[in-house]
Design a protein with these regions (language model features):
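Cyclophilin-like peptidyl-prolyl cis-trans isomerases
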Residues: 1-156
Length: 156
């Protein structure tokens, strides 16, 4: 395990969104490099002010693109860390293009219809508190008035 991922062990990511707080338990045991990168981006303020650019009720809410279009990222691609962790309500996964190793900074939070993503998209977190805030996010691709991440920070 890298020093960065070791530092993230046992931590959570707290998203302050325009709909309320969302606490995500980080899962470094199954995706150490993704947890390390998400932690690094959050600590740098990268996610602050970024919108939820794709929200599909019954499926997922996606964010992490600084352009708000679904086409942007941080510029650093990550090698996939697929696992048997089952996607369910509140599971947080890394968005990617057709290439499995194209995850960057965009991620999604599942509602209920995500089971088919298991083993195909890297899981790096699980919402522990605040799914009610996620469920209130404005729907659309993109939403007419998208909700945003006000701040993202690591907590113990």
């Amino acid at each position: 395990m890298s020093e960065a991922s070791a530092a993230a062990t046992g931590k959570s990511l707290l998203l302050e969104t325009s709909q309320g707080q969302v606490e995500i338990k980080l899962l470094p045991d199954i995706a150490p490099n993704h947890v390390a990168r998400i932690s690094e981006l959050a600590a740098s303020g990268f996610y602050d002010g970024i919108v939820f650019h794709r929200v599909i009720p019954g499926f997922m809410a996606q964010t992490g693109d600084p352009t708000g279009t679904g086409m942007g990222g941080s510029g650093t691609k990550l090698k996939a860390e697929f696992s048997d962790y089952k996607y369910r309500n509140g599971t947080v996964g890394m968005a990617r293009s057709m290439s499995p190793d194209s995850g960057d900074s965009q991620f999604f939070i599942c509602f209920d219809g995500c089971g088919h993503l298991t083993g195909q998209y890297t899981v790096w977190g699980q919402v522990e508190n605040g799914m009610d805030a996620v469920e209130k996010l404005a729907a659309g691709e993109p939403p007419a008035t998208p909700d945003q991440i006000i701040s993202a920070k690591l907590i113990d």
